[in-house]
C-alpha cells in the first residue's frame, strides 16, 4: 500500500481526536429535568409507541435519579430494576451476529421470565445449564451463498433460540463493510459489497423478528478496526460513506418496506452504534 509520509495532523484535528470538542459545565439550567413525578405509568404501556410519542416524557419524569444513573452505568446487557415505572431487572441484550453465544442456557435465562417461567426454562443449577445455543458459520460464509432465503432462516433459528432464554434484543447482524482485510470484526461482517451486505442482513433481521427477536444491526457506522475502536477516527470521504458504508445500513433500517407482497412494514427496531469518531 502507498505510504503518506508528508501528512501532518493540524492542532484542531489533534484536539478533536483527543475528544476535546465539548465543555463540561456545572452551571447549566436543569429546571426542566424532572425526577420523581407522580404518576402510575409503566414501561410496558409503551410497547409499540412511536419515538416521538409524548407519553415518553411522562414516563421518564417518573424515574428516580438513582434509577436513571443506574440505567446509564449498567445499560449494557444486564439492567437493574426501575420500580418507579415497573421495569424489571434482567438480561435483555446479548451478542451476536453468528448466534447467541458466550453463555449457557442457565446464565441467560435466570431472571427474564419472572416468577412463572415456561416449561422450557433452565435454571442456573440445572445439569444442562451450561449447554449453549446454536452458533452459525461466520457472516462472510453466509453472504458467500448469495442466498437471502438462507439468511432469513438463520434469523428465524436465532430468534427461536432467543425464546428459550427470554432474550428480546440481539446485537447483530454485523453490517459494516470489509474496507480492510485486517479489521478484527470482519468475521461478523458480510462482505465488501453494500447491497449484498444490506440484503443479507435485512433478511436475517426480518427472520429474527418473525420470532419476536429485535435484531439491532451494528456497528453503525464506519467501524474499521477492533483495536482502539473506542475513539479511533476512521478516514473516509462523503461519497464512500453514502454509497457504501451507510447504504448497507440503509437497507436494513428500511428493512421490510422493500417487499409489499409480504405485508410487512416495521422497519428496524434497534441499532448498535460504533464507538469511533467519524473522519479526521
Question: What are the roles of these predicted feature ranges?
Answer:
Residues 1-280:
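Glycoside hydrolase catalytic-domain context in secreted enzymes
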Amino acid at each position: 500500500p502507498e505510504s503518506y509520509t508528508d501528512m501532518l495532523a493540524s492542532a484542531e484535528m489533534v484536539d478533536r481526536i483527543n475528544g476535546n470538542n465539548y465543555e463540561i459545565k456545572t452551571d447549566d439550567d436543569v429546571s426542566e429535568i424532572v425526577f420523581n413525578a407522580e404518576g402510575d405509568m409503566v414501561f410496558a404501556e409503551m410497547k409499540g409507541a412511536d419515538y416521538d410519542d409524548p407519553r415518553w416524557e411522562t414516563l421518564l419524569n417518573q424515574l428516580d435519579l438513582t434509577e436513571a444513573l443506574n440505567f446509564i452505568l449498567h445499560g449494557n446487557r444486564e439492567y437493574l430494576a426501575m420500580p418507579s415505572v415497573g421495569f424489571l431487572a434482567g438480561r435483555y441484550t446479548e451478542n451476536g451476529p453468528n448466534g447467541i453465544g458466550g453463555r449457557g442456557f442457565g446464565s441467560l435465562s435466570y431472571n427474564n421470565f419472572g416468577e412463572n417461567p415456561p416449561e422450557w426454562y433452565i435454571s442456573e443449577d440445572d445439569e444442562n445449564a451450561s449447554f449453549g445455543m446454536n452458533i452459525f458459520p461466520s457472516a462472510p460464509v453466509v453472504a458467500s451463498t448469495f442466498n437471502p432465503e438462507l439468511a432469513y432462516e438463520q434469523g428465524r433459528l436465532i430468534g427461536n433460540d432467543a425464546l428459550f432464554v427470554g432474550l428480546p434484543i440481539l446485537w447483530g447482524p454485523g453490517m459494516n463493510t470489509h474496507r480492510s482485510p485486517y479489521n478484527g470484526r470482519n468475521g461478523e461482517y458480510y462482505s465488501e459489497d453494500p447491497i449484498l451486505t444490506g440484503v443479507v442482513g435485512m433478511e436475517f433481521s426480518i427472520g429474527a423478528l418473525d420470532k419476536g427477536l429485535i435484531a439491532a444491526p451494528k456497528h453503525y457506522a464506519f467501524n474499521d478496526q477492533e483495536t482502539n475502536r473506542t475513539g479511533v477516527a476512521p478516514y473516509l470521504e462523503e461519497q464512500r460513506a453514502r454509497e457504501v458504508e451507510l447504504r448497507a445500513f440503509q437497507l436494513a433500517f428500511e428493512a421490510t418496506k422493500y417487499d409489499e407482497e409480504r405485508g410487512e412494514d416495521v422497519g428496524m427496531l434497534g441499532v448498535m452504534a460504533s464507538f469511533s469518531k467519524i473522519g479526521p
